[in-house]
Amino acid sequence: MIDKKIFEKFDLLPFSPSRLNAYRDFPCGFVMRYIYGYDFPASPPMIRGSAIEYGFNFYFTDGYSLDECIQKAFNYYDDGTKFTLDEDKKIKERAFIEPMLNLIYPELSKTNSKYLGYQMQVSTEILGIPFSGFTDYAFENDERITVIDLKTKGKLMKKHSDMLQQAIYKKALEEQYKKPVDVRILIVTPKKIDYVDIDDTKNLMKEIEMSLISCANMIKICKKKESLSSLITPNLDDWQWSDADKRSAREVIWGI
């Protein structure tokens, strides 16, 4: 078990899959956002992904047609990118919305299970540390719960961090509903669509616990945020630094 006071020191509770994955995959990003409090604007690809999820949800809640879902997604995207400076990137990502929804709509609309909701908040504890997060689309039948996490991408590639996220959601939902939970990732590109089934989460949960212990051990020895940032060395070759706002924050925190 981990002492919650370690994470409370920097107001990190409840912890979340996104915080854990940030610590694992981009430690500087974890420090910038969750320790120093930088709030970076969403990129056009991120807004496009949220727009597609938002638009398609109207099929389940209001019985919208494909064209109506697409229009909802366009409206969401246009509103979210009003202040985007990179006009070429903005136009490029918007063009992906319709072909992606053309693939998603027939795939997800064929389920016969009861629709539980979208962006359902779920909670659990891992090694005594409270976790909270939000699922994508959740369904229920007599035997089990099924969660489908929609990932819209440029390439049909699965990410290990997505699987760790779903392992946590599986644990939380099984505790809440007292029945088996299937977690699936639906990866969609403008031309292809495919499922990734996560059948065995036992080793994923072990990996999550090890990462959480590692994070706690680092935070435990630091009394102030400057001490924590001094333990992380920025990798200037990381693609994450393509974002100008992150480079500016890096300059402030690390001086490079």
Please name every model-derived segment.
Residues 7-12, 16, 27-39, 80, ...:
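Short amphipathic alpha-helical segments and their helix-coil junctions
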Residues 20-65, 119:
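Nuclease catalytic cores
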Residues 44, 48, 93, 97, ...:
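Hydrophobic (often cysteine-bearing) scaffold residues that line and stabilize catalytic clefts
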Residues 127, 174-256:
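Metal-dependent nuclease catalytic regions and adjoining charged, substrate-binding loops involved
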